[in-house]
A protein has these predicted regions:
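Active-site groove signature of glycoside hydrolases
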Residues: 140, 144, 148-159, 214, ...
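Metal-dependent polysaccharide deacetylase catalytic core of the NodB/CE4 family, i.e.
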Residues: 162, 175-275, 279-303
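Terminal accessory/targeting
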Residues: 1-154, 164-166, 170-182, 188-195, ...
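Short, glycine/acidic-enriched loop or turn micro-motifs at the edges of active sites
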Residues: 159, 219, 309
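Functionally engaged cysteine thiol sites
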Residues: 39, 158, 241
Length: 339
């Protein structure tokens, strides 16, 4: 074969691969409208705390799925009442949903198959943002600021012996209902504050706000006075995989869908912990405006308060800053924050 023939063959091969990649991207990014309508799994609103065991065989995966008219990325598989279910992520909108696995044809893939999607860009960028590098730990690593002009409201629900501040959450702006908020939920908070959790679901059903459920670990380990390199999830014996997956499993058992975001307790992590979140295809979430910790809000800020009863001063600062115009409005869904 001549050199010219070889060159033409090589060029045809490159073009074919490029077209195949483009076709895959188009399929992946297309909205699976008909599949979403007929295959969505509707979770019942619980009347009491449901055990995590109601969700069976919960596993993290990475699968490229194709259904009736579109595609999606599966990051978890599970069973509900014997039915196989997928936790699907929209690789561009960064939203999640639960759908019947029977509606999809899926294959296990390497990350290279979804490289270039907004999902992988956000996961990788947050994992590579070290925040403040301290001796033995990282502080406020991950995504800390979003796209302006609005703000991103995030409230942490760490384990607490106090009731959630319902009055504060009821005061959130409602000029453009439902107000998008992100709540970082820990497994132990949900187990011990079901009435407050149910109140949140009722408010959401009433249209007051729409909640993005951020994973805040299951146990949220903390010992006062212990150095941060051996505290929070850096505590000896912590299994980050279980902290992540057990929280998601309990949340699904109690009627809600986990998001793609994970916030480390105390905003304290480490390089191995950041990698653990990344391997679960989660976006590590920090904050550039933890109000009670001295953060100053500005357009695009990810604002952090604790409506769990543990940090009333932060709630007062939020009310003050919102009234004075220091907190930029409108509030935006957290899914809009990553570039």
């Amino acid at each position: 074969m001549s050199n010219r023939s070889l060159s033409l063959a090589a060029m045809r091969g490159r073009v074919a691969r490029a077209l195949a990649g483009l076709a895959m991207a188009i399929t992946l990014h297309a909205a699976p409208a008909r599949a979403a309508e007929s295959c969505a799994v509707t979770l019942a609103t619980p009347t009491h705390l449901e055990p995590a065991e109601n969700v069976g065989d919960y596993r993290d995966v990475l699968r490229l799925c194709r259904g009736d008219g579109g595609g999606a990325v599966a990051i978890r598989t599970l069973t509900l009442s014997g039915q196989e279910v997928l936790l699907l992520a929209d690789p561009e909108k960064l939203t999640t949903r639960l759908e019947s696995a029977a509606c999809w044809t899926c294959e296990d893939v390497e990350e290279s198959r979804i490289a270039g999607t907004r999902l992988m860009r956000a996961v990788e960028k947050s994992a590579e943002a070290p925040g403040l590098e301290r001796r033995g730990f990282l502080q406020n690593a991950g995504l800390v600021h979003g796209r302006a002009p609005g703000s991103y409201f995030t409230g942490d629900l760490c384990p607490s012996s106090k009731p959630m501040d319902r009055a504060f959450l009821s005061r959130l702006p409602t000029e453009r209902p439902p107000t998008p908020i992100a709540l970082s939920i820990s497994g132990l908070w949900l187990k011990h504050h079901f009435d407050d959790y149910r109140w949140l679901l009722d408010r959401q059903a009433d249209g007051a706000f729409v909640i993005t459920w951020t994973n805040h670990s299951y146990h949220h380990q903390f010992k006062r006075g212990v150095p941060f390199d051996r505290n929070f999830m850096n505590s000896p014996g912590v299994d980050p995989d279980r902290e992540i997956l057990d929280t998601e499993q309990l949340l699904i058992a109690n009627g809600q869908t986990p998001s793609l975001f994970f916030r480390f307790p105390g905003l304290i992590s480490s390089a191995p912990l950041m990698q653990a979140a990344r391997e679960k295809h989660l976006i590590s979430l920090g904050a550039d405006a933890w109000l009670a910790d001295g953060g100053k809000p500005k357009p695009g800020s990810i604002i952090l308060v604790h409506p769990n009863g543990n940090e009333p001063v932060g709630l007062k600062m939020f009310d003050r800053d919102l009234a004075s115009g220091l907190i930029a409005e409108p509030f935006e869904p957290l899914t809009k924050a990553p570039n």
